A protein has these predicted regions:
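A generic structural signal for short, solvent-exposed coil/turn residues
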Residues: 61, 75-77, 86-88, 143
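Metal-dependent nuclease catalytic core centered on acidic motifs
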Residues: 1-69, 98-180
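A short acidic/basic microdomain associated with nuclease active sites
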Residues: 63-77, 81-82
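Short, solvent-exposed polar/charged micro-motifs at secondary-structure junctions
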Residues: 79-84, 159-162
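Conserved catalytic cores of phosphodiester-cleaving nucleases, focusing on short active-site segments
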Residues: 83-85, 89-98
Length: 180
């Protein structure tokens, strides 16, 4: 199999079942090894990257929600997802966005366009529900290839599929799910 960076770059050329099979092949590569401290988190290195601690915090939260996590390397020459999350036979790629303060999540989401079609938002602070819902809806409107945003907020896991975000009742649904 080609080198890891080439395999990650190939994700941009694939879609549908072919994309899913390729993600699974990447996750099953022998280069992955479990962390000494977390047997459900696999890595191929990258412990020295600037964002490693944020990735690790989100990965541990994903494990709490029943996922096996594959932390992907961050090559400089191509934009790649941060994680492969595995649960119930399904492998999915996610780009991580960690929300710390009151700054606009909208810009951060739009920055992911072209990187990955699914985003994991790890909420570490309170954020205006309506602003977040608007940013999510806008992200799906701008990125026609996007299909899911997964939000971790405390002990809540809130999945938002494209079809839901583009419905008129999305704001009411989101408020109920996010604020409960």
């Amino acid at each position: 199999m080609r080198n890891f960076t080439d395999e990650l770059a190939k994700l941009h050329q694939l879609s549908g079942a072919e994309y899913s099979r390729h993600v699974e092949r990447i996750a099953l590569r022998k280069e992955f090894h479990p962390l000494d401290t977390d047997s459900e988190i696999y890595t191929v290195g990258g412990e020295n990257s600037d964002d490693y601690q944020n990735l690790l915090i989100a990965a541990r939260k994903a494990v709490e929600f029943g996922y096996r996590v594959y932390m992907l390397p961050n090559p400089t020459e191509t934009r790649t997802p941060d994680f492969i999350l595995y649960k119930k036979g399904v492998y999915r790629t996610y780009d991580l966005k960690t929300v710390y303060g009151k700054a606009s999540i909208g810009d951060s989401l739009l920055d992911s366009v072209g990187q990955c079609n699914s985003i994991l938002i790890n909420m570490t602070t309170e954020y205006n529900t309506r602003r977040l819902a608007y940013a999510i809806k806008r992200y799906f409107e701008v990125n026609e290839k996007a299909w899911e945003i997964l939000i971790f907020k405390g002990r809540k896991r809130i999945p938002i599929k494209r079809t839901l975000a583009l419905k008129p009742e999305f704001f009411a649904f989101f408020k109920k799910a996010y604020e409960r």
